[in-house]
Structure formats: structure tokens, C-alpha cells
Amino acid sequence: MTNLEKAARTYCLPETTTPENLACRWTCNVNFGKRFLAAGYYYTYKEPCYYGAVYEHTDDDLSCEGEIRLIAVSEERFEDNGHALAWAMQQ
């Protein structure tokens, strides 16, 4: 199992989905060109709890119904969702 697969399981991230489905499950998400970025919260006692995730459109359908595929999840956890999204934008 790859690190990406482990992170997807830990944070319950679907490996493929649509922006619409992901937006219904995560409150902090952004269309960013051909990528779709999400920040999520994973409780860890007295430690930073936010992570970033990057999805990529699998075809030219950039609408909310186009398929996206998980390509990166932060190994680091951040103090807030803004820092998690900033990480995702740099990927």
C-alpha cells in the first residue's frame, strides 16, 4: 500500500469522485485550474489537525460532475485549513 493510499484511508478520502460529491463532504474546497483542492480536519489531541488534499481532473470536463482523482495528501498536519490549502496550491 502506498503512502497516498494510507493517507486516503486515514482521512476517509475517496480516490476517485466528483467535485460535487467532495464539496458535499468537505467544507473547505477550491477549484484551482485542472485541480480540485480540499482541506480537512482530523482530530489529534493537542497537535495540528488540518490536512491538505489535491485532486486532478481525469478528463476535460471541469464541471462539478467531472471525475477527479486523488494525487496528493499532505504528510504534515497544519494549524488551520488556510495553511492546508496553501500547501495544496503549491503541489
Model region roles, listed by residue range:
Residues 15-16, 31-33, 40-41, 68, ...:
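Alpha-helical interaction segments
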Residues 5-6, 21, 36-37, 51, ...:
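N-terminal cationic amphipathic segment used for targeting or macromolecule association
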Residues 1-36:
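Negatively charged, low-complexity tracts enriched in Asp/Glu with abundant Ser/Thr
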Residues 9, 18, 33, 58, ...:
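Terminal low-complexity, poorly structured segments
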Residues 9-10, 25, 40-41, 54-55, ...:
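Short stretches within intrinsically disordered, low-complexity N-terminal or propeptide regions
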Residues 38-71:
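Short aromatic-glycine-(Arg/Gly/Cys) micro-motifs in beta-strand/loop hairpins
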Residues 1, 6, 47, 77-78:
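Intrinsic-disorder-associated interaction segments
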Residues 63-71, 76-91:
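A short, charged, amphipathic alpha-helix used as a generic interaction element across diverse proteins
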